[in-house]
Amino acid sequence: MTSHRQSSDTFGGILPSTLSSRYLSIVNQLPEEFSSVVSEMMVHLENIFSLAENFFQAIERFSRTPDLLERNKMSIGVGAEGDSWPCHVSHEAPMGSAQTTENSAKEEDKQVPESAALQHPKFKSTPGPQLPTRRRFLSESDELQDPQPVWDAEPQFCQGFLIQGLWELFMDSRQKNQQEHGGEDSSQESKDSGLCDFKPEPQPRHRNSLSDSADPFLIKSPSALLDYYQEDVSRPQPETQESSGRADKFLKPLSWGSEVLESSCNQPSTALWQLERFTVPQALQKVRVLKHQELLLVVAVSSFTRHVFTCSQSGIKVWNLVNQVAEDRDPESHLKCSVQDNKVYLRTCLLSSNSRTLFAGGYNLPGVIVWDLAAPSLYEKCQLPCEGLSCQALANTKENMALAGFTDGTVRIWDLRTQEIVRNLKGPTNSARNLVVKDDNIWTGGLDACLRCWDLRMAKVSLEHLFQSQIMSLAHSPTEDWLLLGLANGQHCLFNSRKRDQVLTVDTKDNTILGLKFSPNGKWWASVGMGNFITVHSMPTGAKLFQVPEVGPVRCFDMTENGRLIITGSRDCASVYHIKY
């Protein structure tokens, strides 16, 4: 690089080396800080309108009462050390007749007529910031903290740069008014100075007033507000998780609220930019371990009942997500097969699309067991007949239809209202290990490595596509026409369910894939298998976002419909992960 020399005192010359290096270091830091600055601005601007509106209302009240400044100036007393303290100032109001004696004038000064209080509402002091774990509203019975001076030099709600500027303009205007009234007779001040011994009556705090210190939008700094929005309602401790595959340390149980198990779109305070950031996750944080103590086959999570269901051969254990313990060994319920026989055991379970019904099927059972989750207590509602068949896959539709895939290749359909068999679809042996229902089509895949599409209107196979390896898992995108397959050779394949001639291999692993599931928005999917990892992929490229190691092969997993929790089953334990965006 060619070097240039020029006197540092020359106007318009090259900066000295010390200033130049400092300038370059600042420029290099700009890209790193740009993202956080933009996010902070978005968070702060979202709350600035209501805050500024309240502020300008206060200024407007001040401008309408020119004598309010003089009365507030008399409300400041000076102590022995020069400090100021708040003191009560009475407001004179027309009483309907002229007062002629000095005693009556003093009595009038000591009274606060109700009409005057309505005409001149007082500014409320803002208590110091607190650290609430969740945003709450104060009741009318909450006690006030010690009152602060009316004119607070640094009010707690002025933390942003824009509001700080408005406050400075207001203080400048106040100082000018004080200078204009500085030549007035001081006898009036000495006359009312004795009133400083009176303390203001505690006023109840209103829920939307600036004195509500529990409101995080009023008491937090911009950086604290950014953290408030970035944290989940569950309030987990932030834990960085890189895509290198390092596992998060097991944390203490989290105290999440109902928002974790409810759709974020249903929350009235959710803004558009908050929804957009729930596109792809950044990490998984383990928050709980459920000790099932038997080899897990299937796990399911219900946002409706806020429970996790872990299925093994002997039965299904029900765990309450509200209980906050790091390692839970005591389930709420244990649902067992009604038939007690060594040759009878469960193989799979499934939650209905509305999370109100639990299905369970297995080997040598007389029927698929149906439990009613909407009832006050769990009970076996009915059994869907399938005697002599071994169930290995379950599915259901919103039209009160239940489906099951059996080892002999049969796909059976029941009407849940009558528990009667609607139709049997006969396929090759071991061809119905996986079931996916989409519109009027049933997609099946199994150990014969063939993907089949059954048309429910004609009750026959409309498509067969052969893959290179056995189909171990199936999942359909909730937003697009892509069907995702997990193969025994470790491949992820995307199959276009509408065009039916487009197959994309998007990722390859060294181990068998045992489970796949799309996110609710269809922007990513998660996969588990024999590789001892939970892997998160982006859609549609299949790029690996990050991995989370488990203690052993992950046979099964499930995800809540709002994309907030993932439940995995590895060996004899189920792990609850909080998805961090």
Curated annotation (Swiss-Prot):
One GO BP: positive regulation of neurogenesis
Q: Outline the WD repeats, range by range.
A: 246-283, 291-329, 341-381, 384-424, 427-464, 466-505, 508-547, 549-580
The observed outcome of changing L365P is:
Impaired formation of the subcortical maternal complex (SCMC)
Q: Which SUPFAM superfamilies match?
A: WD40 repeat-like (SSF50978)
Write out the annotated subcellular location: Cytoplasm; Nucleus
- Write out the tissue specificity statement of the associated record: Expressed in spermatogonia (at protein level). Expressed predominantly in ovaries, where it is restricted to growing oocytes, with greatest levels in fully grown oocytes. Expressed predominantly in testis, heart, lung, liver and muscle, and at very low levels in the brain, spleen and kidney. Expressed in bone marrow-derived macrophages and osteoclasts.
- Keyword Translocase set for record: no
Q: What induces it?
A: Induced by E2A-HLF, a chimeric transcription factor containing the transactivation domain of E2A linked to the DNA-binding and dimerization domain of HLF. Induced during TNFSF11/RANKL-induced osteoclast differentiation.
Pinpoint motif Nuclear localization signal by residue range: 132-138
* Signal peptide span: none
**Which residues fall in a compositionally biased region of kind Basic and acidic residues?**
175-204
Give me the Gene Ontology terms describing cellular component: cell cortex; cytoplasmic lattice; cytosol; nucleus; protein-containing complex; sperm midpiece; subcortical maternal complex
Following inactivation of the gene, the phenotype reported is:
Females show normal ovarian histology, ovulation and egg morphology, however fail to produce offspring following successful mating. Progression from one- to two-cell embryos is delayed by 4-6 hours and embryos failed to develop into morulae and blastocysts. Embryos form unequal sized blastomeres due to smaller, dysmorphic, and displaced mitotic spindles resulting to asymmetric division.
Tell me, what is one Gene Ontology molecular-function annotation carried by this entry? structural constituent of cytoplasmic lattice
Q: Which residues form a coiled coil?
A: none
Keyword Transcription appears in the UniProt entry: yes
Q: Which residue ranges does the record annotate as region Disordered?
A: 90-134, 175-216
Swiss-Prot/TrEMBL keywords:
Cytoplasm, Nucleus, Phosphoprotein, Repeat, Transcription, Transcription regulation, WD repeat
Phosphoserine PTM positions: S139, S187, S209, S519
Protein purpose: Component of the subcortical maternal complex (SCMC), a multiprotein complex that plays a key role in early embryonic development. The SCMC complex is a structural constituent of cytoplasmic lattices, which consist in fibrous structures found in the cytoplasm of oocytes and preimplantation embryos. They are required to store maternal proteins critical for embryonic development, such as proteins that control epigenetic reprogramming of the preimplantation embryo, and prevent their degradation or activation.
Q: Please quote what the entry notes about the protein's domains.
A: Contrary to other WD repeat Groucho/TLE family members, does not contain any identifiable Q, GP, CcN or SP domains. Only the C-terminal WD-repeat domain is conserved.
Q: Which family does it belong to?
A: Belongs to the WD repeat Groucho/TLE family.
What is the annotated quaternary arrangement, including any partners? Homodimers. Component of the subcortical maternal complex (SCMC), at least composed of NLRP5, KHDC3, OOEP, and TLE6. Within the complex, interacts with NLRP5, KHDC3 and OOEP. The SCMC may facilitate translocation of its components between the nuclear and cytoplasmic compartments. As part of the SCMC interacts with the SCMC-associated protein ZBED3. As part of the SCMC interacts with the SCMC-associated protein NLRP4F. As part of the SCMC interacts with the SCMC-associated protein CFL1/Cofilin-1. Interacts with FOXG1/BF-1; the interaction inhibits TLE1 interaction with FOXG1/BF-1.
Task: Name it.
Answer: Transducin-like enhancer protein 6
Q: Which gene encodes it?
A: Tle6
